[in-house]
Design a protein with these regions (language model features):
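Metal-dependent de-N-acetylase/amidase catalytic core
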Residues: 2-6, 19-29, 116-265
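Active-site rim/loop-helix segments in enzyme catalytic domains that contact anionic ligands
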Residues: 20-133, 161-168
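Bacterial N-terminal signal peptides
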Residues: 5-15
C-alpha cells in the first residue's frame, strides 16, 4: 500500500480490571490489514493495548510486493522481502505479537470479486487466523479503505462479512480505522482529499485515549516502513496526529453504539 500512515486514529484502551491487574485470561485484539504499513493510523492504540497487557496481533493479507513509494527498489519479490522485515520491525516497535503474513498478491485483492474461488480462498484464510486467535475485538479499515484503496476495501469487506455472519471465533466488536483529512494532507501535501472517504463525526463514537509514549511507539513503527514513507512525511504526520486528536483517537464501530472508551465492552 502507498502508506496509510497519517493522523493516527485508533481504538480505545481502558483495559481496567483483569487485564490491568494481571488476573484472569488476557484479552486479545486483532488488527487485519491489507499491507504491512496499514497499522499507521492506529499504531498508538495498538501500542497502548499491548502495554496494558492485551495480546495484540496484526494479520497482513498481502505480500506488499507492489508498494515502492519511498524506495528505488523495483516492485516484486525484493520489495516483498523487505516489507516482511519492516512488518517485523513495526511489531517490535509497538510491542505487539509478530505479524501474521498471509502472502496474497499485493494490488490484486480488488479483483477477487470477479473470481468466487479466489474470494472464498482469501476469506477462508482470514477467517482461519481470526478463529485461531479468538479475539475479543477486531480493528480493520472502514468501507472507504482509508482513501479508496481497493485492497483495503476488500479486507474491510471480508472482516465485516465474517463478523456479520457470526463466523466462529469472529466477535461483533469490529472497529473501523480511517484517515482524517488532516492526516491525508500531512501525508500527501500536494494531493487533495479524495471525496467520500472521511466518516461523519457522529459515527466516531469510540474515543480512545493514548499517551505520548504510545505516540512515540507509533513513530518508531512508522520509521520501520522505510520503503513506504519518508522521514520528512513522518515528521509532518506525528504532529498532525497529536494536534488533531489531542490524546484521544476516534474509531467507528461496525455496530452503532453509545459513546465509549473501551473496545471490550
Amino acid at each position: 500500500m502507498r502508506v496509510i500512515v497519517c493522523t493516527l486514529i485508533a481504538a480505545a484502551v481502558l483495559v481496567s480490571g483483569p487485564i490491568a491487574r494481571g488476573q484472569g485470561k488476557a484479552r486479545t485484539l486483532v488488527a487485519v490489514w491489507a499491507h504491512a504499513d496499514d497499522e499507521g493510523p492506529v499504531a498508538p492504540v495498538l501500542a497502548r493495548y499491548a502495554r496494558e497487557g492485551v495480546q495484540v496481533h496484526m494479520i497482513i493479507v498481502t505480500d506488499g510486493a507492489q508498494g515502492a513509494a519511498n524506495t528505488s527498489v523495483a516492485r516484486g519479490p525484493e520489495i516483498a522481502r523487505l516489507r516482511v522485515e519492516e512488518a517485523r520491525c513495526a511489531a517490535r516497535a509497538l510491542g505487539v505479537q509478530p505479524s501474521i503474513l498471509l502472502g496474497f498478491p499485493d494490488g490484486a485483492l480488488g479483483h477477487y470479486n470477479a473470481d468466487p474461488a479466489l474470494l472464498y480462498r482469501v476469506t477462508q484464510r482470514v477467517h482461519e487466523e481470526i478463529q485461531r486467535l479468538r479475539p475479543d475485538a477486531v480493528i480493520t479499515w472502514g468501507p472507504d479503505g482509508g482513501y479508496g484503496h481497493a485492497d483495503h476495501r476488500m479486507v474491510s469487506s471480508i472482516v465485516t462479512q465474517l463478523a456479520r455472519a457470526g463466523a466462529p471465533g469472529v466477535p461483533p466488536q469490529v472497529f473501523y480505522s480511517f484517515l482524517p483529512a488532516e492526516g491525508i494532507r500531512a501525508m500527501y501535501p500536494t494531493r487533495g482529499v479524495p471525496p467520500f472517504v472521511v466518516p461523519r463525526a457522529e459515527l466516531l463514537t469510540v474515543q480512545v485515549p493514548f499517551t505520548d509514549a504510545d505516540l512515540n511507539a507509533g513513530r518508531r513503527s512508522f520509521e520501520c516502513h522505510k520503503t513506504q514513507v519518508s522521514q520528512e512525511a513522518i515528521d509532518r504526520v506525528i504532529p498532525a496526529m497529536r494536534d488533531t486528536w489531542n490524546g484521544q483517537a476516534p474509531l467507528s464501530p461496525m455496530v452503532p453504539e453509545a459513546p465509549a472508551k473501551d473496545l471490550f465492552r
